[in-house]
Amino acid sequence: MSSLLSKTRRLNKILQKTGTEPVAFQDICTLLSEVLECNAYIVSKRGKVLGYTFSPGFECEAMKKKVIEDKKFPEDYNLTLLESNETLANLSNQGRCVFAEIGDCKTKDKISTIIPIIGSRERLGTLILARFGKEFTDDDLVLVEYSATIVGMEMLRALQEDLADQTRKKAVVQLAIGTLSYSELEAVEHIFEELNGNEGLLVASKIADKVGITRSVIVNALRKFESAGVIESRSLGMKGTYIRVLNEKLLDELKKIK
């Protein structure tokens, strides 16, 4: 069995999870690092580190700080990555650190390969590989470009799932608002003006006096929102009622009504 085939099959095992379970970017980085003996990084379009694995014995405090602590590459370096629309293989560091502010690199024989991650004709991120003293072969590049395609598909799926989730949350809020009477809607607007954020303490009697409505109107409005799952509330007795927004679309939709 060829080395490329065995490596590809190992990668495919990551993909053979349940259909609804997303492929972890970290798993792909770990596998690439193991089979290619390299550092592997998956970076979003905005430079956020989505997954990474360092090869054994890798010692670069500058890179570890960016990846582990900051979890983000510098903007200027990320812009350089985004300039490339095709694979750039076996780039020598020529004694310089990839981060301009660092200057000289302690490792003189570092070799990097940059692979764009593209989905639906849109740049989604970058797959970066780096190792020392040994160039990436054509078989290696076949594997990493295949990996970049997989990552692109997963990024698109994540974006689509997020869009669907946001749409669902918005629809739930709109339905909840639609169940309110005019006076209940007026009460809700004043409630969240008083909260001035996603959570806080509400004294229903104060709002009732201020708006000129009964306390029961406020209670009914809160019950409807709680039943819809857009807020949670907890009575604190004489202190009032603690309210927390569970659906972040609620405040946006209330602003639109105003």
UniProtKB/Swiss-Prot annotation:
Keywords: Cytoplasm, DNA-binding, Repressor, Transcription, Transcription regulation. GO terms for molecular function: DNA binding; DNA-binding transcription factor activity; GTP binding. InterPro entries: CodY (IPR014154), GAF-like_dom_sf (IPR029016), GTP_trans_reg_CodY_C (IPR013198), Transc_reg_CodY_N (IPR010312), WH-like_DNA-bd_sf (IPR036388), WH_DNA-bd_sf (IPR036390). Residues 204-223 bind DNA. Pfam families: CodY, HTH_CodY. It comes from the Bacteria. GO terms for biological process: negative regulation of DNA-templated transcription. Residues 1-156 are annotated as: GAF domain. SUPFAM superfamilies: Winged helix' DNA-binding domain. GO terms for cellular component: cytoplasm. It is found in: Cytoplasm. The keyword Transcription regulation applies. Its main location: cytoplasm. Belongs to the CodY family. HAMAP family: HTH_type_CodY. DNA-binding global transcriptional regulator which is involved in the adaptive response to starvation and acts by directly or indirectly controlling the expression of numerous genes in response to nutrient availability. During rapid exponential growth, CodY is highly active and represses genes whose products allow adaptation to nutrient depletion. This is Global transcriptional regulator CodY. It comes from Clostridium botulinum (strain Alaska E43 / Type E3). The lineage of its organism: Bacteria, Bacillati, Bacillota, Clostridia, Eubacteriales. The gene is codY.
